[in-house]
Amino acid sequence: MAKSQLTTLTRQLIPMTTSMTNILDIIKADYAKFPEAQTYSIYSEDVYFKDPVYNFRGIKQYQKMIGFITFWFKNLKLDLHDISRTDNLIKASWTMSWDAPLPWKPRISVTGWSDLTVDKFAGALENGEGDRELIISHIDYWECSKFDVIKQHFQFLR
């Protein structure tokens, strides 16, 4: 293999590998500081989001949802248990807990996982070169029902 071919091959492989590594690192960092200072630039403009409560499309709606959570859910904590990637699917398992905005401030906890689908977008890097992976779909699943979450608000009624 000629040196120029090897250089071309290296340039093709390194950005892809770096992109894959970087998006996982960014997601880990975002989960650790959630809901503060999220990296919205890793999401496509028309990202699809779904969980047991919300179902919408668009980064602006996603930002509004995070704003709602930030305002109403106090002492919010998102513990990342595991994150892995297979092809274009990133799976993250987590537990989110918060103090509910009620006078008795019950601590609510939901364990679940997120399926994040990524796609490549040409020339999306900050310097205008290369490809960048963006999250095009973010679907959250809970290991409990919505009713189970509601019951946590009123445990004193047992």
Which residues does each PLM region occupy?
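C-terminal and inter-domain tail/linker signature
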Residues: 1-158
